[in-house]
Amino acid sequence: MKTWAVLSSLALLASSVSARTVFSSLTVNGVDLGQGVAVRVPSSNAPVTDIESDDIICNTGFIQPVSKTVAAVPAGGTVIAHFHHTSAGYVGPDPSDPLDPTNKGPVLAYLAKVPDATQSDVTGLKWFKIWQDGYTPATRQWGSDKLFINGGNATFTIPSCLQAGQYLLRVESISLLNAEQYPGAQFFLSCGQINITGGNKVQPVGVDFPGAYTSTDPGIVTDIYEVGTYTPPGPAVFSC
């Protein structure tokens, strides 16, 4: 019998609620930009669950006014996306900050080139994946486990060969706690606003949101208590 098979629906609901998390700030090459700066922060830490909704692009219901800052990031630079339990960022001791450790799933980062990173319309963009942290069978550790251990810091490098210009940076933590069927997976995501400087002229092929994820994708519909190997949803990670 599965260890968790006896959990009540109430307990599952409680875990689902406490697993909530929000990407709400950025650090670029060691410089913390501050809470809500250059990030479209949703006012709620509730997840997106409908992968066919436009909410799967950058979320919805943003704290107003939305930041007009576009963060300068050199190609090849290091970015940290900071997650916390609430939209306000770190607000003091909280056993569920940055997310409840019962949350299990991958953490991923995408970019989409845009004319203006502050534009309100985010539909029709082409997204390419630049980083992911999925599941390590040898240690039975998920990307979300590392996110918790690292205090909500998802750290990755901007590819050095990318064409300079403005981009939206989509970072998400996916909870697979109740993902044995669709809908079940929960998507916690926001979009940062960056301007990549330097670099080269590479424009990677992108995918659509909605569209990149499907209701039958084993990266979205899975049993975390019986997982052997795991491939996160979406395209392969781009590399120069």
Swiss-Prot record:
GO CC term (a single one): extracellular region
UniProt cross-references to InterPro entries, sorted A to Z: AA9 (IPR049892), AA9_LPMO (IPR005103)
Range of residues in the leader sequence: 1-19
Disulfide bridges in this chain: C58-C191
GO BP terms: cellulose catabolic process
Keywords: Carbohydrate metabolism, Cellulose degradation, Disulfide bond, Glycoprotein, Polysaccharide degradation, Secreted, Signal
Residues that hold (1,4-beta-D-glucosyl)n according to the record: D32, F62, S67, N153
Keyword Nuclease belongs to the record: no
Carbohydrate attachment residues: N153, N195
Subcellular location: Secreted
Major site of localization recorded for this protein: secreted
Induction or repression: Expression is induced upon growth on hardwood pulp.
Cited CDD domains: LPMO_AA9 (cd21175)
Function comment: Unusual lytic polysaccharide monooxygenase (LPMO) that may have a hitherto unidentified role in fungal degradation of lignocellulosic biomass in conjunction with other secreted fungal enzymes. Binds polysaccharides but does not have the active site of two highly conserved histidine residues coordinating a copper ion (the histidine brace), which are essential for LPMO activity.
Similarity comment text for this entry: Belongs to the polysaccharide monooxygenase AA9 family.
Protein name, UniProt field: Unusual AA9 family lytic polysaccharide monooxygenase B
Organism annotation: Panus similis (Lentinoid fungus)
